[in-house]
From Swiss-Prot:
This protein's name: Flagellar assembly factor FliW
Similarity annotation: Belongs to the FliW family.
Primary site of residence: cytoplasm
InterPro entries, A to Z: Flagellar_assembly_factor_FliW (IPR003775), Flagellar_assmbl_FliW_dom_sf (IPR024046)
Higher taxonomy: Bacteria, Pseudomonadati, Campylobacterota, Epsilonproteobacteria, Campylobacterales
Superkingdom, natural source: Bacteria
One of the Pfam families matching this protein, by short name: FliW
Any one cellular-component term (Gene Ontology): cytoplasm
Gene3D superfamilies linked to this entry: BH3618-like (2.30.290.10)
Entry-linked NCBIfam families: PRK13283.1 (NF009791)
């Protein structure tokens, strides 16, 4: 599905339209749809499949995305891929929030002070190992 970014992705402020493609229940891909010499193509992960994950969406983001009780909200975190997938890093401090009801999206920058259990370079393997131990 295509989304219009109402608040930019950090480092990609020139991109305002993206396509979100699901790879599987855990991973998705975000691809820029804006004509630009600096294209965006990143892997995202569903944070709720990895860990306990909860944060407050700031009021200004709620307003920008026109969120209400009927909105279908999807949240993803950016994955920095490494050669070995389990060595990849997840940024839990800058989630991407999408309202699939109206096609709006935004990135939220969370404070480490408010969310000390979230990191911006958490290794994917630590969550994969935890999941294996639970099974």
């Amino acid at each position: 599905m295509n989304y219009f970014l109402k608040a930019p992705i950090l480092g990609f402020e020139h991109i305002n339209e993206v396509r979100l493609e699901k790879i599987d229940s855990l991973f998705s891909r975000l691809i820029s749809q804006t004509n630009s010499p600096m294209a965006l193509d990143m892997v995202l992960v569903n944070p709720y499949c990895l860990r306990e994950y909860s944060f407050v969406i700031p009021k200004y983001i709620e307003l920008l995305l026109e969120l209400d009780s009927h909105s279908k909200v999807e949240v993803y975190c950016v994955v920095v891929l490494q050669k070995n997938l389990e060595d990849s890093m997840v940024n839990f401090l800058a989630p991407l929030v999408f309202n699939s009801k109206n096609g709006f999206g935004a990135q939220v920058a969370l404070s480490m002070m408010d969310y000390p259990d979230f990191g911006f370079r958490d290794p994917l393997k630590s969550f994969v190992i935890q999941e294996r131990e639970r099974a």
